[in-house]
C-alpha cells in the first residue's frame, strides 16, 4: 500500500553525470495531482485516496462527476485513480490537497510505471512475435513471410487457443518495473526515470513505488 501519482509522458531526453556518462531518461509531468476523495475503513470498508489529474472542460464532465469534484472543492480532472494507503497516512491528508512530486518520491528510488503502449494496427507474426522470415529463393514461392503451419493432425483437428498468429499489435496496458528515478524537478513537478516507458508522448501514465526487488546478479 503505497502512494502513487498520475502523470503525462512528456518525452525522452538525456542527463549527464558528473563523470560524463549519458543517461537516457523519460520525463513525466505529475503536476496537479489533487485529492478528490478520502476513503476510510468506517465509511467505505478500506482506506484509500482518490486522485484527480489534469484538466477537463466543464462540458465534458457528467453531472455526477461534476458534483463529485465540487464536493471536494477541486477542479474537474481527466479521470480518477485510487491508491490504497495506511490509515495513519490518510489521517494527515485532506480533500483538495495537491501532492507534489518530491513528496511522493525521491531521486534514486525504484518505481513501476504503467501506461498504454503505442497501437501499431494489424501486424504479421514477424513484427508481432519476431518470427524468422522464410528463404528468399531456392524453392520458396510466395511464402517468404508466412508463419508456417498452424494446425495439427486430424486429431485434435483444430488450432489450439493462444497460437501465435497475426493480429492487433500494441494499444494494451503495460507496466515497466524497477525503473530508477534519475532526477526530480520539484519546481516544475517533473519526474525523470532512467529508460523508456510505455505509450506515446502526451499519454497518461501511473507511477508507483516498485513492488518487486530484482534478483542480484551472481
From Swiss-Prot:
Keywords: Methylation, Ribonucleoprotein, Ribosomal protein, RNA-binding, rRNA-binding. The modification N5-methylglutamine is found at residue 154. This is Large ribosomal subunit protein uL3. One of its GO terms (cellular component) is cytosolic large ribosomal subunit. One of the primary rRNA binding proteins, it binds directly near the 3'-end of the 23S rRNA, where it nucleates assembly of the 50S subunit. GO terms for biological process: translation. It comes from the Bacteria. The lineage of its organism: Bacteria, Pseudomonadati, Pseudomonadota, Betaproteobacteria, Burkholderiales. Part of the 50S ribosomal subunit. Forms a cluster with proteins L14 and L19. It comes from Polynucleobacter asymbioticus (strain DSM 18221 / CIP 109841 / QLW-P1DMWA-1) (Polynucleobacter necessarius subsp. asymbioticus). Disulfide bonds: none annotated. Methylated by PrmB. Belongs to the universal ribosomal protein uL3 family. InterPro entries: Ribosomal_uL3, Ribosomal_uL3_bac/org-type, Ribosomal_uL3_CS, Transl_B-barrel_sf. One of its GO terms (molecular function) is rRNA binding. Coiled coil: none annotated. Gene3D superfamilies: 3.30.160.810, Translation factors.
Amino acid at each position: 500500500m503505497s502512494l502513487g501519482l498520475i502523470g503525462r509522458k512528456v518525452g525522452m531526453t538525456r542527463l549527464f553525470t558528473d563523470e560524463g556518462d549519458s543517461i537516457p531518461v523519460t520525463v513525466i509531468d505529475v503536476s496537479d495531482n489533487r485529492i478528490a476523495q478520502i476513503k476510510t475503513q468506517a465509511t467505505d470498508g478500506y482506506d484509500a485516496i482518490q486522485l484527480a489529474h489534469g484538466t477537463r472542460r466543464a462540458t465534458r464532465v457528467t453531472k455526477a462527476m461534476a458534483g463529485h469534484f465540487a464536493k471536494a472543492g477541486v477542479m474537474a480532472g481527466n479521470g480518477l485513480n485510487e491508491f490504497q494507503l495506511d490509515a495513519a497516512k490518510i489521517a494527515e491528508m485532506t480533500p483538495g490537497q495537491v501532492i507534489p512530486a518530491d513528496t511522493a518520491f525521491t531521486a534514486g528510488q525504484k518505481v513501476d510505471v504503467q501506461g498504454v503502449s503505442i497501437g501499431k494496427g494489424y501486424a504479421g507474426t514477424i513484427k508481432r512475435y519476431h518470427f524468422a522470415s522464410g528463404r528468399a529463393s531456392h524453392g520458396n514461392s510466395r511464402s517468404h513471410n508466412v508463419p508456417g503451419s498452424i494446425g495439427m493432425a486430424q486429431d485434435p483437428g483444430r488450432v489450439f487457443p493462444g497460437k501465435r498468429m497475426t493480429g492487433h499489435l500494441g494499444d494494451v496496458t503495460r507496466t515497466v518495473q524497477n525503473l530508477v528515478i534519475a532526477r526530480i524537478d520539484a519546481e516544475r513537478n517533473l519526474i525523470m526515470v532512467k529508460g523508456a516507458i510505455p505509450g506515446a508522448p502526451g499519454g497518461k501514465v501511473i507511477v508507483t513505488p516498485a513492488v518487486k526487488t530484482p534478483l542480484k546478479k551472481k
